[in-house]
Amino acid sequence: MATQRASGLLQRLAQGSLVKQILVGLVLGILLAWISKPAAEAVGLLGTLFVGALKAVAPVLVLMLVMASIANHQHGQKTNIRPILFLYLLGTFSAALAAVVFSFAFPSTLHLSSSAQDIVPPSGIVEVLRGLLMSMVSNPIDALLNANYIGILVWAVGLGFALRHGNETTKNLVNDMSNAVTFMVKLVIRFAPVGIFGLVSSTLATTGFSTLWGYAHLLVVLIGCMLLVALVVNPLLVFWKIRRNPYPLVFACLRESGVYAFFTRSSAANIPVNMALCEKLNLDRDTYSVSIPLGATINMAGAAITITVLTLAAVHTLGVPVDLPTALLLSVVASLCACGASGVAGGSLLLIPLACNMFGIPNDIAMQVVAVGFIIGVLQDSCETALNSSTDVLFTAAACQAEDERLANNALRS
C-alpha cells in the first residue's frame, strides 16, 4: 500500500504543472534563505547540478536536432529562417533604440571609483566580428566541449546536407539519436523545480540584495526598459507578423521560457527549454531546430539594452554632450555589439568599452562602468537572459504561425 502511494505521488509530480512546481521551488528557496543561510548555501549544489546538466545536454541537442532536421528535409519543403532572422535583428535594434529613449527620459549617473582588473575587453567591433567568424571554423569536438554554438551550427548544417545523400537507414539512425537526446532533455527539465529551489536559495544567501540599493535608479531604468521591450515593443513586432492579439503568445513565452532563463542566467542552458516549448506550440521542427540555437547566439535585445543604458549612464556622469545622430549611431553600434555578445567572455558587459569609445571615454573609466555592471549583475543578467531567451521562442512562433496562416489562406483561395 505504501509503495502504491509513493508511486502515485511520484506519478502526480511527474505529470503535474511544471510552472506551478517551479513557483513552489521559488517560494521554498526564499524561505530557506531567510531561515538558514548555511543551509541555503549548501543546497546551492542542486542549482549548480541543474544548470550543469542543461549546459551539458544543450550542445549535443543542437548538433543532433539540426543535423537530423536538414538530413531528413524533404525537397520543396519551406523553412522560415529568413523572416525569423529579420525579426531577431529588428528586435535587437528596437531594444537599443528604446534604451536610448529611456536613458534620455530618466538619465542615470554612476559612482565611478572602483576598477575592474584582469579583464580584457575586445578592442573594436572588427575584433568582435572576427571572433564570430573564427567561431565558425572551430574544430567540432572543441565546439561541443566549449559550447561554441556558431561552430556547432556550421558543423550540424554541413553534416546535415552531406547526409541528405546517405542511405535511409543512416537518416533514420540520426533521427533516432535526435529523439533520444530530446528524451534526455525532457528528463533534465523535469528537475527544474529542484534546480530553481537551489539557485534561489544560494543566490539570496550568498549575495542578498543590499548592495543593489545604491544602484536602484540604474536598475529601475534597465529593468523598466527590458519590460517595455518585452511587453510593448516585442508584442508590436509579433502583431505586425501574425495580425492578431499577440499577448497570449507573449505571456506563454515569458512564463515557460523567461522564468527558466531568469534563474539559470544562461541562454545556452535555456536552449532545451525553448526547444520543448516550440514542440508544445506545435511549430515546424525544421525551423525551430535551427532558429532557437541561432537566436541564443545573435538575438540579444537584453544585451543591447545593457550596453546602451550603461554607456549613456557613463556619458551623463561625465557630462559628455550627445546629439540625436550620435544617439542613433549608438543604437546601431549597441545592436552589432549585442549580436556578438555570445562570442565574448563576459558577454554584454565587456562590450560596453566599445560603445564608450564612441564618446571618447577613456578605457579605465569604461572598465569602471563594467565593474558597476558586475555589481548589479544578479538582477541585470537574470532579466537580460530572460528577455533574450523568451524572445527566441516568441519570434520563431510568430514567423511559423504567420507562414501557417498564409498557407491556409492560399489553400482557401484555391
UniProtKB/Swiss-Prot annotation:
It is found in: Cell inner membrane. GO terms for cellular component: plasma membrane. One of its GO terms (molecular function) is neutral L-amino acid:sodium symporter activity. Keywords: Amino-acid transport, Cell inner membrane, Cell membrane, Membrane, Symport, Transmembrane, Transmembrane helix, Transport. The chain crosses the membrane at residues 16-36, 46-66, 84-104, 143-163, 180-200, 219-239, 300-320, 332-352. InterPro entries: Na-dicarboxylate_symporter, Na:dicarbo_symporter_sf, Ser_Thr_transp_SstT. It is a multi-pass membrane protein. It catalyses: L-serine(in) + Na(+)(in) = L-serine(out) + Na(+)(out); L-threonine(in) + Na(+)(in) = L-threonine(out) + Na(+)(out). Gene3D superfamilies: Sodium:dicarboxylate symporter. It comes from the Bacteria. One of its GO terms (biological process) is threonine transport. Belongs to the dicarboxylate/amino acid:cation symporter (DAACS) (TC 2.A.23) family. HAMAP family: Ser_Thr_transp_SstT. Involved in the import of serine and threonine into the cell, with the concomitant import of sodium (symport system). This is Serine/threonine transporter SstT.
